[in-house]
Amino acid sequence: KFDTVDIQKYIQYKMLQSEIKFSNARAVGNKNVIPLPHQIEAVYGRMLQVPRVRFLLADDPGAGKTIMAGMLMKELMARYQSERILILVPPLVLRQWQEELEEKFGLHFHIINRNTLREYGRKNPFIENDLVLASMYWAIRDDVKPLIQEADYDLIIVDEAHKMAAYTQGTNKKKVFRTKLYQLGEAILRKAEHVLLLTATPHKGDTENFRHLMKLIDEDVFTSSVVNE
């Protein structure tokens, strides 16, 4: 008689055995993480198949986006493609992200906040630490945003990425209103080698709003308003 864990392990084994594209997998061997088939396919079958990982990961709440983000981080680090990582999340889930990444992947992320700034004095904590977690709303402050811009990151992950919103206004579709979060995205995401945006609500019925979000991933492809969905 098999339980759920046995079935998941068997599916994982068969996928890894039958697909050569999964042959270099590192994160799935972690005893603390038993990824589901859709998580394996997303990370190994899609994201890691391109030299620059720049993806919008849209999935239902509870589908394990944090797990997929952790798997991606472990793989990129194991392949020496990412050393410095920044994760921006809503403030209420900062500790949850930190604890889950520590427990499941052995990754210790430093939470940077106003107390951290005081502790570091004249030093920039975003430069001094390689693995950083910060509140996305705190990051847009005028005294914080420049500190993030000074630090170069190999991989930037944004949870609730749809909050980095921009809107085309007017009938001529030439005036664009950019929220402060979107302006932060423009400032830091385009210079990062790898970007992963996480959201459960990527498209809210506004095609232009969605196009602006995708521009943060690939400005060349999504610059023109004639790009169709």
Task: Identify the role of each PLM range.
Residues I188-T207:
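Conserved helicase ATPase motor motifs in RecA-like P-loop NTPase domains
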Residues F210-T223:
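A short helix-turn-beta junction within AAA+ P-loop NTPase domains corresponding to the substrate/partner-engaging
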Residues F2-I7, I11-M47, A63-R190, V221-E229:
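SF2 helicase/translocase NTPase motor core
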Residues D60, P90, T201:
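P-loop (Walker A) phosphate-binding loop of NTP-binding proteins
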Residues L57, G62, A161, F210:
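Conserved S/T- and glycine-rich ATP-binding loop of Class I adenylate-forming
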Residues R54-A58, L86, L196:
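Short hydrophobic/aromatic beta-strand immediately N-terminal to the Walker A/P-loop
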